[in-house]
Amino acid sequence: MKKNSIKESIDAMCKSLGFKKDRRSGHYMREVTPGLEDAIHFFFKPYSGKAVSVSFVVGIYLKELVDLIDELYEKTDGYKSLLWLWCGDLLPDPKVVQWMYYTENGDPEQLCGEIRQFIVDYAEPFFVRNHDWKDISDSIVKRKYADAEGTPVAVAMYYRGEQDRGIDYWTEILKGRDNRNEKDELFLKKYRSLPPYDGDIQRRYSVEAIEGARKRK
């Protein structure tokens, strides 16, 4: 029986999660909240070879972000030691953009510093021991944002695994700068269209919630 390549495995994972492949870009997309398709999409870009990379950009609630990380973890069993969370800026090598924002009273605030420190203090030692990613994502909410499950966040996240380079890969990544550019600003405007989160996911899928969000744009 022929063994699937890494690219084929990632393709199958994306499809099983309900993503549709965009013919023009080659990215996988999934609408999360009906009616807000311009604001909420995931972008998966699988690569073949030794590096397993899955990237996405999303405007979403923090709780939903963690749920998605857990969902990805379940679908990528066998790659769990290769799923790393980065938060920083564009580096010469590798070329990766990652940033995360949330808002308080409509004022964007970067979380890169907190997330990076969280990785250094907590996550990094566990990766050496092939720690489960699900525990990491749970801890981000429980330890850092216990009362912020309904916080809107704008995120660009990048998962990458390279067996050859291993944990030494952290050294350069953690030197990333926390700079915002024009593309960041344009994206930040989009997640403000999220309807109110009150713990009931079905409520924000309703017509009333969607219409209310459009009026606030």
Q: How should each PLM-predicted stretch be described?
A:
Residues 23-29:
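Long, charged, glycine-rich C-terminal linkers/tails
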Residues 1-23:
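Amphipathic alpha-helical segments
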Residues 2-7, 29-217:
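Intrinsically disordered, low-complexity regulatory regions enriched in serine/threonine/proline
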